[in-house]
Each structure stands twice: as C-alpha cells, then as structure tokens.
Regions:
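Cofactor-pocket helix-loop regions in the catalytic cores of large enzyme subunits
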Residues: 1-211
Length: 211
C-alpha cells in the first residue's frame, strides 16, 4: 500500500527468463502494484553469439548442440561442460562418451585456462588468449582450403590434426567457441556450416540469453 501511495516504481532485476512460472510471478506483481519494471540483465553476456546467429540465420537466439550425435568435438575457449551459453550440454555429451561398438566421441579443447571441459578432453592444447582467434581462423582455412600454414609450429600442427578429424567426421563434427567476439562466433558457425554439422541444431534455438 505504501508503494502504491508513493507511486514509486518497483524494479525487479533477473537474468533472461524463459520460465513461464517466473513470467507469471512478474505479471502478478504488476497486477498488484501496477508500477513494476522488469529488467532482464545477463551477468554473462552472449551478445556476440546472438549477433552472429542472427546475422547468419535471421533469428536472435542461441542454437542448440546435440553433442550425443557428435563423433568429433573441437572447442576453442568454450567451457560447454560449465556454464557456456547457459549450460545443460553435459548429459548428451556424456552419452556420446560411452563406447558403443568400440567407438566414442573425440573431444579436442583449445583453451588458455583449465576448465571443466578441458579436464575431460581427449586432447587439450594450451593457447594464449591472443591466439584463440587465430586458432579459429586457421581451423576455417584448413577445412575450407585444406591447409593451415607452411610454418610447422606445434600449434599449427595441432590445428591441422583437429581439422583433419573434423573433416573426416563431416556432419558428425562440431566446433564450439566461447570467444566473446562476433567475428569469432561467425567463424565457428561458418565452420559448422562447411561441415554440414548435424550436431548444430539451428532450428532448435534457445531464448535463455538476450545479451
């Protein structure tokens, strides 16, 4: 009653919420006080991924990744077993890691700091933060053009091997990136498109982040 009498605006701050129950609760508050402002703020921004997906596919959302389908997973700075893009990927990842007929998914992680995903990878390649963008660029070049570089540095060799495995797996391969840069996110989507990846599900989008 005091709030109503004072005509003060009540600000309710939440993360991006796709939950019907949360939306109903906010609506009830608004009915009661009539001056509720609902502000959605994501502590971990996914603007780069949202911008990239919107540019390539016309929808501002995050795609889903069915890692159970993957034979080869290459991550460049994406802790997808942590809270990357809202999390929730570990169950289907785990299913793909169970040997079936002597086969299981292969996971290669390029990262600067140890992560849960890196700890579970078959191959973890340590890269500097400044090298992560170049790693994606070289992966794209290797998959589209067939080679990385004439200079056989340990990183270039690792990238070439990863690209070879991605191409061999084809539609059963996927590249993920946690680099907060629109161009890097576009590169990852372009690589998956070149691979005809079935793991990347562009029609099964998630609206769990707005920015």
């Amino acid at each position: 009653n005091e709030f109503k009498a004072a005509c003060l605006t009540i600000a309710v701050i939440t993360g991006t919420s796709a939950s019907p129950s949360t939306k109903k609760l906010i609506a009830k508050l608004n009915e009661t006080f009539e001056n509720v402002a609902h502000v959605e703020y994501d502590a971990v921004s996914e603007s780069a991924a949202l911008d990239a997906f919107e540019l390539m596919y016309g929808t501002r959302a995050l795609p889903d990744y069915n890692l159970e389908k993957a034979e080869v997973i290459v991550s460049v700075g994406a802790d997808f077993l942590g809270n990357w893009q809202g999390g929730g990927f570990e169950a289907r990842y785990s299913k793909g890691r169970v040997p079936t007929n002597g086969k299981m998914s292969r996971h290669i992680q390029f990262e600067s700091n140890m992560s849960l995903s890196g700890a579970n990878a078959d191959k973890r390649i340590l890269v500097k933060p400044s090298e992560q963008n170049q790693t994606l660029i070289k992966l794209y070049q290797a998959i589209v053009n067939g080679n990385v570089s004439t200079e056989a540095t340990p990183l270039n060799v690792a990238i070439q091997k990863a690209a070879t495995q991605l191409k061999t797996a084809g539609s059963k391969a996927v590249v993920l990136t946690g680099i907060q840069d629109k161009n890097a996110q576009i590169l990852a989507l372009a690589i998956n498109k070149a691979l005809n990846s079935e793991v990347l599900e562009v029609s099964a989008t998630k609206n769990i982040r707005k920015g």
